[in-house]
Amino acid sequence: MDLEAQKRAPIYEALERFRKKRVVPFDVPGHKRGRGNPELAALLGEKCVGLDVNSMKPLDNLCHPVSVIREAEELAAEAFLMVGGTTSAVQGMILSVCKAGDKIILPRNVHKSAINALVLCGAVPVYVNPEVNGDLGISLGMDIRKVEKAIEENPDAVAVLVNNPTYYGICSDLRGIVKLAHEKGMKVLADEAHGTHLYFGKGLPVNAMAAGADMAAVSMHKSGGSLTQSSMLLLNKGMNQDYVRQIINLTQTTSASYLLLSSLDISRRNLALRGEESFGKVIQMAEYARNEINSIGGYYAYGKDLVNGTSVYDFDVTKLSVYTLGIGLAGIEVYDLLRDEYDIQIEFGDICNILAYISIGDRIQDIERLVGALADIERLYRKDKTGMLTGEYISPKVECSPQKAFYAQKVSLPIEQTAGKISGEFVMCYPPGIPILAPGEVITQEIVEYILYAKEKGCSMQGTEDPKIERLMVLV
């Protein structure tokens, strides 16, 4: 890496030059540097709204970059800058390699953006059902033996998609999967929404590009310090960059936010220059928090002790995932208590676990406050866990492709009456955004009970036409 070159931030520098010129705007956006919306300017600040500008020659154009945006992408190792979140990056990957009828091998515990891409392009999923840790109620990684079996049984598949890592920090044998897939001429796509730091920290699981994957969708905003909704799509050698750009432009906005673009540019510079040091501190804070939480009693903050060489090939130690059923509370209940009673906002709570996202903006005093609150919750709210559900993953039975089911003729039924039917829509807790049900899957009584239980516990649910999640669209 050329550290001298990495000190540059071309988009940020161009915006600074633009700001100093005091250009009179007769273009969009219509707030005209905030003058037309003083309440917005007061909320965000005049400098912020003053830099919310449209594409122009001095600032380049994301859809066809030739100057400062192109320079920024080159400094990010030929990455595509994305302003539609990692959702758009994941969909860009899949649409770049899959066409209607193509098979793609992937774990079922993927983010909804991956299955949405299958709805758009008509590709057919070949699911490698992940192993499940029944004690923790979480799905694990892709066992390489199952991946090998799927590749052997589906030699016509065009790609394999891998989570690296999962939301909970679980990593599969990415290098091994890449080797197997490439031997059969398949592309390897990595959803690294939760893996930005893998490119900068020491002692962390291998990142997708180093493992030889063909493409990786990376959420710079999650752990890299850029603004929400900003992301990157990385390409390895052998991918046609011009074709991928065309695919991205099918769905990406033509009005890219320069606030998002400049945040990617600045964050890339910061991580290139100081990322190793910054994430070294993150690892220390996460390990400290894990040890402190485990000393409380009742909780289990898991880490590398889960590694088994197969379904948990490695573990991302920056992830502070905590099992809560030991104190008789669902993860979502602890999540709500932390926010409502202690003014602590963590990433998510599910049926069995919580996740506190630790990154470059955290301080040790924040960690102490979280640990203290969890100790308080254990002391004040602990109860018997009898009767609580422990499963987080339900293996699906796929009857038809997501696209076919999504566009099929459907009817709305009360959830309690849908067992045995084929789902025509998604149901998921968000976060993490992993579908409990996806279009084309059979609804079982177990799934119905799980959805009702998750609702009862207060999980934030989405995906259905019915905003109350009381009815489901099923195929006629």
Could you tell me what each predicted segment is?
Residues 1-52, 432, 464-465, 470-476:
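N-terminal glycine-rich, Lys/His-bearing helix-loop that initiates the first secondary-structure elements
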Residues 8-16, 64, 71, 84-305:
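Conserved PLP-enzyme active-site core in the AAT-like
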Residues 48-88:
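Conserved N-terminal alpha-helix of the aminotransferase class I/II PLP-enzyme fold
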Residues 50-59, 75, 125-135, 316-317:
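Gly-rich Lys/Arg/Thr-decorated short loops/hinges at beta-loop-alpha junctions or inter-strand turns
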Residues 59, 80-82, 160-163, 321, ...:
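Short glycine-rich or small-residue beta-strand-to-loop segments that form or flank ligand, phosphate
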Residues 79-80, 125, 346, 472:
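Generic structural signal for residues in well-ordered beta-strands
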Residues 122, 127, 456-467:
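Short, compositionally biased
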Residues 288-463:
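Conserved C-terminal alpha-helix-loop-beta "cap" of PLP-dependent enzymes
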